[in-house]
Amino acid sequence: MLTLKIAVYIVVAFFISLFVFGFLSSDPTRNPGRKDFE
């Protein structure tokens, strides 16, 4: 059960960091494929 909780925390932290990095580098010149988010 502890392993499952650790895996859930890793997945949640991964998605939060992915969202933060996508929000910080949201200028369309660096990643042109993300224009549909605006």
From Swiss-Prot:
Highest taxon above the source species: Bacteria
Disulfide feature: none
Entries under InterPro entries matching the protein: PSII_PsbI, PSII_PsbI_sf
Entry membrane topology: Single-pass membrane protein
Coiled coil: none
Residues annotated as transmembrane: 6-26
Gene Ontology biological-process annotations: photosynthesis
Leader peptide range in chain numbering: none
Alphabetical keyword list: Membrane, Photosynthesis, Photosystem II, Reaction center, Thylakoid, Transmembrane, Transmembrane helix
Localization of this protein: Cellular thylakoid membrane
Chief site of localization: membrane
Pfam families: PsbI (PF02532)
GO cellular component: photosystem II reaction center; plasma membrane-derived thylakoid membrane
Family classification: Belongs to the PsbI family.
Chain's role: One of the components of the core complex of photosystem II (PSII), required for its stability and/or assembly. PSII is a light-driven water:plastoquinone oxidoreductase that uses light energy to abstract electrons from H(2)O, generating O(2) and a proton gradient subsequently used for ATP formation. It consists of a core antenna complex that captures photons, and an electron transfer chain that converts photonic excitation into a charge separation.
Subunit structure: PSII is composed of 1 copy each of membrane proteins PsbA, PsbB, PsbC, PsbD, PsbE, PsbF, PsbH, PsbI, PsbJ, PsbK, PsbL, PsbM, PsbT, PsbX, PsbY, PsbZ, Psb30/Ycf12, peripheral proteins PsbO, CyanoQ (PsbQ), PsbU, PsbV and a large number of cofactors. It forms dimeric complexes.
HAMAP family, per the entry: PSII_PsbI (MF_01316)
Protein name as it appears in the record: Photosystem II reaction center protein I
Name of the coding gene: psbI
